[in-house]
A protein has these predicted regions:
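Short helix-loop-beta connector
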Residues: 121-128, 211-212
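Glycine-rich Rossmann-fold phosphate-binding loop(s) that bind the pyrophosphate
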Residues: 134-135
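Rossmann-like adenosine-cofactor binding region
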Residues: 174-261
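N-terminal ligand-binding/catalytic initiation module
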Residues: 1-107, 115, 125, 269, ...
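Conserved beta-strand elements of the Class I
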Residues: 128-130, 289
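N-terminal Rossmann-fold NAD(P) dinucleotide-binding loop
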Residues: 138-139
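NAD(P)-binding Rossmann-fold cofactor-contacting core
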Residues: 148-174
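Adenosine-phosphate binding glycine-rich loop
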Residues: 226-313
């Protein structure tokens, strides 16, 4: 069985081919049973973190399952909040084919999915990117978005300014025009694409800040209690999702619905429908578009297949 650690997994998932692989699997489809999310309690009964189990398979090809842990309190101990492992098997025999670093796979396929969505939903001339958050996933947003839009300027905001400054510095080392910002409202108003990748449980981006033509990419929340944008963002936007699962699990949408600002019938399409040409993306330059992703095992399988095939070549 092939073993790919974090560095090897990253090397085998360059963003342009990964975006193409995701597009292809969204078009062809695969079997994706409901994922399981389990809250892991502390001894006092409060929630320490969550464990996610995400299987998917293509009959006659490969099957895979990812186990991911998300423990936000880890950052206070100098640890990553996200850990995971992915196992790829032969769907005909069940023979294990490869083990990949789940956190690296998750990070890269997540931002690649956002970039794939932006290829349909962001304005063609979108060049100003705002990254909200400074964690593992945020580190790769600019690279992925640059594959689909002419990103020329990146700004970074984080609830801890030091995190934003550190990420902006790393981006500058890679040749990106990047700066950390303190004023989130002003940064949102200046951006063409706003990409949020946090574990926030309260709204960070307010709808009144969004100017016409903005694309809002919401990556972080995956439970009903989490949200990165307020209800006004959802009310003003043409909403798209990575899958229908977002309607049941994304706090950004569920809490907006509770406020009367959103209903499931208002979703303009899923990413699969966009990729298959079944739904139109952005209609004009003045629309505000919103893409909410919660992740799916299809996305993991596409990345794992690409990494495994590349390692065999």
């Amino acid at each position: 069985m092939l073993i790919l650690d974090a560095e090897a997994t990253r090397a085998r998932l360059p963003f342009a081919p990964l975006i193409d692989a995701l597009r292809a699997l969204f078009v062809s489809g695969c079997d994706v049973p409901p994922r399981a999310v389990h809250a892991i309690p502390k001894p006092d009964g409060s929630v320490a973190g969550h464990v996610l189990l995400m299987p998917a398979w293509q009959p006659g090809a490969q099957l895979g399952v990812k186990v991911v842990s998300v423990f936000p309190g880890n950052t206070a101990q100098g640890l990553s909040s996200l850990h995971g492992v992915y196992l790829l098997l032969d769907a005909r025999t069940g023979v294990p084919l490869a083990q990949l670093d789940g956190a690296e796979l998750t990070s890269r396929r997540t931002v690649a999915v956002s970039a794939l969505a932006a290829s349909f939903l962001a304005r063609a001339d979108a060049s100003r990117l705002l990254i909200v958050g400074a964690g593992r996933i945020s580190a790769w947003v600019a690279d992925a978005m640059s594959c689909v839009r002419p990103i020329a300027r990146v700004r970074v905001w984080n609830h801890r300014a030091a995190g934003a400054q550190a990420l902006a510095a790393r981006l500058r080392e890679r040749g990106v025009d990047a700066l950390a910002v303190d004023d989130l409202a002003a940064a949102v108003a200046e951006a063409d694409i706003v990409s949020c990748a946090t574990l926030s449980s309260r709204p960070l981006v307010e709808g009144r800040w969004l100017r016409p033509g903005t694309h809002l990419d919401l990556v972080g929340s995956f439970t009903p209690e989490m949200r990165e944008a307020d209800s006004e963002c959802v009310r003003r936007a043409h909403v798209f999702v990575d899958s229908d699962e977002a309607l049941a699990k994304a706090g950004d949408l569920l809490q907006a619905a509770a406020d009367g600002a959103f209903a499931a019938a208002q979703v303009h399409g899923t990413l699969a429908q966009l990729c298959r040409g079944e739904r139109p993306g952005r209609g004009d330059a003045s629309e505000i578009t919103l893409f909410k992703s919660v992740g799916s095992a299809l996305q993991d399988l596409a990345g794992a297949q690409l990494a495994w095939q590349g390692a065999r070549a």
